[in-house]
Amino acid sequence: SMRKNNYGYHAESFVCDYLEAEGYQIVKRNYIADGGEADIIAVLDEYVCFVEIKYRTNGSGLEAAIDTKKQKRIIKSAEQYMRKTGCRLQPRFDAAYVSSYNGEDLSLEYILNAFDASGV
């Protein structure tokens, strides 16, 4: 729905603002790969971070963790990104849990190393 997409866009910008404030450089948003995608790709120090945004509304606890199928898609996008750009940084897979209580005020819980490539 338009509302969902609009919320998604705001949430994504909100996460990017947070990352930039923490010193990350945003290199891609909505990276689409063959058989995969990544919401945000950001660089900090020796890490290139592939960030998955998860939404929750009305403080409904942590949504289901990022399932294995989704992890595979993110890892696939990471592999392609690394190959295409020749990026030599250490890949890291993070999750950004965005909550909204009224569709306006967003809050963020940011998880470093939410998963790694070994389990899939």
Language model features by range: what are they?
Residues 1-29:
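Acidic-basic catalytic patches of nuclease active cores, encompassing PD-(D/E)XK
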Residues 2, 6, 10, 35, ...:
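Residues at secondary-structure transition points
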Residues 23, 34-38, 91:
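Short beta-strand or tight-loop elements
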Residues 31-33, 55, 97:
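Short, glycine/acidic-enriched loop or turn micro-motifs at the edges of active sites
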Residues 35, 46-50, 90, 108:
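Structural motif
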Residues 38-59, 74:
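Conserved catalytic cores of phosphodiester-cleaving nucleases, focusing on short active-site segments
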Residues 56-78:
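Mg2+/Mn2+-dependent nuclease catalytic core
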Residues 84-120:
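Domain-level recognition of nuclease-like catalytic cores that cleave nucleotide substrates
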